[in-house]
Swiss-Prot record:
It comes from the Eukaryota. The gene is ANG. It comes from Chlorocebus aethiops. TRNA binds at residues 45, 105, 127. PROSITE patterns: RNASE_PANCREATIC. Keywords: Angiogenesis, Cytoplasm, Developmental protein, Differentiation, Disulfide bond, DNA-binding, Endonuclease, Hydrolase, Nuclease, Nucleus, Protein synthesis inhibitor, Pyrrolidone carboxylic acid, Secreted, Signal, Stress response. It is found in: Secreted; Nucleus; Nucleus, Nucleolus; Cytoplasm, Stress granule. This is Angiogenin. Transmembrane segments: none annotated.
Amino acid sequence: MVMGLGLFLLVFMLGLGLTPPTLAQDNSRYRDFLAKHYDATPQGRNDRYCESTMRRRHLTSPCKDINTFIHGNRHHIKAICGDENGNPYGENLRISKSPFQVTTCNLRGGSPRPPCQYRATRGSRNIVVGCENGLPVHLDESIFRP
């Protein structure tokens, strides 16, 4: 009985030790997603907005060809990964049931070297995300290309 309890406690403690890094990694990928693609209340949504926001978020070294910022409520974006605001889309992706306000920043010119100049395109559309453990970690920007 004592031996069984000791083994149980050992396995339980090992399980606790392994879980937090996994959760931390998931949260890290989600935080990266938010840093690259989420801006709750943008100012301007024009070319200057794209250039300053891309620079502030360190997405300009080298210049990124395209980046889309999603505006609105973070909870609604998370909900795409469940049935509340998302449906399966393609292979391992989810599409939002409701449209989001977005600003897509397209690199002008062909050089990947700063200074980066962007053209802003504003719109409202459904978005497609990749999810891990119920959190969005990837935005499929192929649907935003002209």
